[in-house]
Regions:
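Glycine- and acidic-residue-biased ligand/ion/polar-headgroup-sensing regions
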Residues: 102, 112-132
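Short acidic-glycine-tyrosine-enriched beta hairpin
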Residues: 131-155
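Conserved short histidine dyad/triad with adjacent acidic residue
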Residues: 94-114, 142
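A short hydrophobic beta-strand segment most commonly corresponding to one strand
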Residues: 97, 117-119, 162-186
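A short, N-terminal "cap"/entry segment at the start of jelly-roll beta-barrel domains
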Residues: 1-94, 107, 140, 183, ...
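Asparagine-centered strand-capping/turn motif at beta-strand->loop junctions
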Residues: 158-160
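Beta-strand/loop edge motif enriched in small/polar residues
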Residues: 153, 172, 189-196
Length: 198
């Protein structure tokens, strides 16, 4: 399994709105340890918040879904970065919302057999992912309407630079959450005050 990743910021830099962030993040390549991964994700959030102190994304369903997670209802999974609301689980099909709090980020991960599609519904953030024919991780902005398809073996990571709501549809032959290969995980953080309550 590959554990050192150069980062390709060309797509991020192509948008004048994000060129400065791309330039500064370029100095943090490669990601080759848990420490460098966490430093990259934290710095991405810091630079984003400096560039966009009022944010650029809008949310409508985020607070309602986050409340479901915080009240630990059935069909939810609480995480350090926010949580998951499961809307369909008919093996091997899984559909769920990923509710990523501002400054939260998921592990850099891949799957052996799971095939997943992500649709960004609300908020804004970044995604790191490795296209099948590339060696580097591509860095792109996540905004409503963005879609991604990750075939088995494709590394990826979501960074919630702002509150972020992503819908995931997957075919998960091993069973839900049984095919998670973590390359680098977020450092443990204390649960922050929900962004909608600030």
């Amino acid at each position: 399994m590959k554990t050192s990743f150069d980062l390709n910021h060309a797509k991020l830099a192509a948008d004048p709105l994000f060129g400065g962030i791309a330039h500064e993040l370029g100095a943090l390549s490669p990601i080759n340890s848990r420490e460098s991964f966490n430093r990259y994700c934290r710095e991405a959030c810091r630079l984003w918040n400096k560039a966009f102190p009022n944010g650029i994304g809008k949310t409508e369903q985020f607070a309602k879904l986050l409340s479901r997670i915080e009240h630990a209802n059935d069909g939810v999974i609480r995480t350090g970065w926010g949580g998951v609301v499961i809307t369909l689980h008919e093996h091997p099909r899984v559909e769920k919302y990923l509710i990523v709090r501002k400054n939260g980020y998921l592990a850099l991960e891949m799957h052996e057999k799971k095939d997943e599609r992500l649709d960004v519904h609300e908020g804004a953030g970044l995604i790191l992912w490795r296209p099948a024919d590339e060696q580097s991780l591509t860095v792109e902005v996540l905004r409503p309407g963005a879609e991604f398809h990750f075939q088995p073996g494709m590394e990826h990571c979501i960074i919630g630079a702002e509150d972020l709501l992503v819908f995931e549809r997957s075919i998960d032959p091993k069973g839900m959450d049984q095919d998670l290969i973590f390359i680098y995980e977020p450092n443990a953080i204390a649960s922050p005050v929900p962004s909608h309550a600030r």
